[in-house]
């Protein structure tokens, strides 16, 4: 692939989601309706690379303080309903999402109900009746990471078998 892998320096900078949208508008004239600001739009995700480079001289940016409505019911929230999680953006592409997980039975049941979930997740919720320690988790986009690391132009070319909205089997 004739690419040089550069080991990044740490710590990676972090910004609140609301602050990112504010800076994208002020610096680059990027504006979206308030209804879209509960997550990063695809274009906002791309622009975070420029923002991270301009502001922090970093290819990486942790995005924090997402509102709960767009995330999984098992992500822990603070007293204001803000998730205790993050997205990690590298070169304008989300490569991982992580969060502290909810471990308190009453809270996770309430969160599941808010999302309209019921019997289909009962088996999962039952684990928490017996006590669960505080914990966290993350999911990494290995195909996206491979694409960026090797300079491959499309994630379709970085996967063994591409699956997408219109193609689920080989």
Language-model regions, residue ranges each:
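Metal-assisted phosphate- and nucleotidyl-transfer catalytic regions
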Residues: 1-91, 113-114, 119-126, 131-132
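Conserved phosphate-interacting/catalytic interface
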Residues: 95
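Active-site pocket scaffolds in enzymes
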Residues: 99-100, 104-170
């Amino acid at each position: 692939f004739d690419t040089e892998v550069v080991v990044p320096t740490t710590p990676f900078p972090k910004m609140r989601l609301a602050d990112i949208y504010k800076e994208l508008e002020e610096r680059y004239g990027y504006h979206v309706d308030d209804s879209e600001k509960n997550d990063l739009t695809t274009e906002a995700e791309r622009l975070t690379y420029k923002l991270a480079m301009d502001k922090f001289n970093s290819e990486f940016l942790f995005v924090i303080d997402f509102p709960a409505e767009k995330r999984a019911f098992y992500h822990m929230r603070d007293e204001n309903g803000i998730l205790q999680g993050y997205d990690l953006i590298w070169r304008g592409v989300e490569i991982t999402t992580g969060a502290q997980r909810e471990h308190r039975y009453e809270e996770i049941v309430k969160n599941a109900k808010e999302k309209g979930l019921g019997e289909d997740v009962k088996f999962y919720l039952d684990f928490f009746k017996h006590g669960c320690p505080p914990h966290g988790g993350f999911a990494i986009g290995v195909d996206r990471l491979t694409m960026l690391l090797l300079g491959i132009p499309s994630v379709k070319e970085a996967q063994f078998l591409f699956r997408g909205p219109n193609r689920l089997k080989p």
